[in-house]
Amino acid sequence: MNKKIISALLCGAMVLSCAAPVMAADKAGDGQKIALVGKSAGNAFFEIAAKAFKETAEAEGATVDVVYPEAATADAQIKVLDNLISQQPDAICISANDVNALQAKLEEAMDAGIKVSSFDSA
């Protein structure tokens, strides 16, 4: 196999592990609403991971909304998280630009009953 295929498979497996606790909560992913938040639009790594995540979660009955911030900054991701918290998805899986800057907002999401997981976060 070439390196791109192996990378894509590994990315997909990693991202899917983020959804496992959410989809295990119900019978598979039936009715679960999951938001997948990227670092920025056009990030090749995230595009591959998001595609695999979305395909697998939707095959299990979940609905996945892939969301990108306006800029590759923590402040832009905070705006995305504010919007998502008001929508009350079952889970948010985020590739954080700055996990320390997002900590309070992610705790707010968890306090609102939203499951939160992170991957590829610095």
Please provide the spans of the model-predicted regions.
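A residue-level marker of the well-folded mature domains of exported/periplasmic proteins
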Residues: 2-10, 14, 22-122
